[in-house]
Amino acid sequence: MKKILIGGIRLYQKYISRFTPDTCRFYPTCSAYGIEAIQTHGALKGSYLAIRRISKCHPFHKGGLDFVPPKKEKNADSEHSCKAHHHH
C-alpha cells in the first residue's frame, strides 16, 4: 500500500506539479512531506499526516518549515519505568 501511495505522489510530482506555479507555502513541499510521512509512519498515519498538511496549504496560512514528526517508539520508556517500580 505504501508503494502505491508514494507512486501516486511521484506521478503527481512528475506529470502535474511541474506544470503548475510554485504555490506550496511550506518546506518541504506538501508532496515531499507526503512521501516522507508515508515512509516514516506507514500508509494510514502517513496519509493522515499528509492530508492534514495539505489542508493547511492555502493563502490564509503563513506556511513555513513543517517537518514530518519522528516515529515514536512503542512503550520503550513506559515498560522500563513500570518494571523499575515493581518489587518482587
Swiss-Prot record:
Signal peptide (UniProt feature, chain positions): none
Topology relative to the membrane: Peripheral membrane protein
Compartments it resides in: Cell membrane
Pfam families recorded: YidD
Disordered, as annotated region: 66-88
Biased composition (Basic and acidic residues): 69-82
Major localization listed first in the record, in broad terms: membrane
Any one cellular-component term (Gene Ontology): plasma membrane
Record-stated family: Belongs to the UPF0161 family.
Function: Could be involved in insertion of integral membrane proteins into the membrane.
Keywords, sorted A to Z: Cell membrane, Membrane
InterPro entries: Membr_insert_effic_factor_YidD
Record's protein name: Putative membrane protein insertion efficiency factor
Membrane-traversing stretches: none
